[in-house]
Amino acid sequence: MKAQPILAGCARGPVLRLDHPLSFWGGVDPASGALLAPPQCSIAGTVLMLPAAIGSSSSSAVLLELLRNGQAPAALILGQIDAILGLGILAAGEMGWKAIPLLVLDAAEQARIETGTWVEIDAGGGILQMRQGAHIQA
C-alpha cells in the first residue's frame, strides 16, 4: 500500500484508526496524548489514521506540544492534506525535536487497515502491514 508523503519519514507502530475527523485543539490532551472523546485512548506512539483534521490553527500548537512532551503519534495519516498539522511537525523539527511523518491516504485505503495492526512506513510513503492484534492503551 502506498500513501502520499507530505512530510517524509520512517515510522512504525500500531494503527489507531478513527472514522471521524479530529480536532487536536480540545480533542487531545497535549500533556498525556489522551483523546478526550471516545475511544479515549492515547495516541502516543501510534500510527494515527484520520479521515481529516478539523479545528483551528491552534491544532498545530497542540501537535507541537505533543511532540515536545514525547506523547505524539509515531506518524500521522490523513485522508486529505492538512497544512495546520504539517506546520506543527515542521516547527518541531526546526526546534530540534522529533518530527513525524505526515502522509495522505484516502478513506477507502485507510479502511483496509484495522486498529491494532502494526505497520511500518518507509520514507517513500510505503505502508507495510506487519501483524494484527496490538492493544491500544486506554
Residue ranges of each PLM-predicted region?
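Phosphate/diphosphate-binding glycine-rich loops and adjacent basic-rich segments that engage nucleotide
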Residues: 124-138
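Feature captures the catalytic cores and cofactor-binding loops of soluble hydro-lyases/lyases
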Residues: 3-7, 11-127
